[in-house]
Curated annotation (Swiss-Prot):
Any Pfam family the entry gives: MinE
Entry GO CC: plasma membrane
Taxonomy, superkingdom: Bacteria
Keywords: Cell cycle, Cell division
Function (record text): Prevents the cell division inhibition by proteins MinC and MinD at internal division sites while permitting inhibition at polar sites. This ensures cell division at the proper site by restricting the formation of a division septum at the midpoint of the long axis of the cell.
Family: Belongs to the MinE family.
Source organism of this protein record: Yersinia pestis
The name this protein goes by in its record: Cell division topological specificity factor
GO biological process terms, semicolon-separated: division septum site selection; regulation of division septum assembly
Keyword Cell cycle: yes
């Protein structure tokens, strides 16, 4: 009887398979594999505020976003300050 069921069973429609694959892709993206869309603007704004007080090279500012678990996000900010103080321009 199992052999008969094998040949008479219907395959899943391709629409259902595509839907399942899309749900997997969306779930992976929500998991935090990519950085937030606002991160470049945030980095630019932070650099502007720092430059009001001390002149630094934009390459000396590093911003990193990490997703830890479902409800914890970490924003790490590293600024390399020059050894001598310069007045802002």
């Amino acid at each position: 009887m199992a052999l008969l069921d094998f040949f008479l069973s219907r395959k899943k429609p391709t629409a259902n398979i595509a839907k399942e694959r899309l749900q997997i892709i969306v779930a992976e993206r929500r998991r935090g594999d990519s950085e937030p869309h606002y991160l470049p603007d945030l980095k630019r704004d932070i650099l502007a505020v720092i430059c009001k007080y001390i002149q630094i090279d934009p390459e000396m500012l590093h911003v990193q976003f990490e997703q830890k678990g479902d409800d914890i996000s970490v924003l790490e900010l590293n600024v390399t300050l020059p050894e001598t103080e310069e007045t802002p321009k």
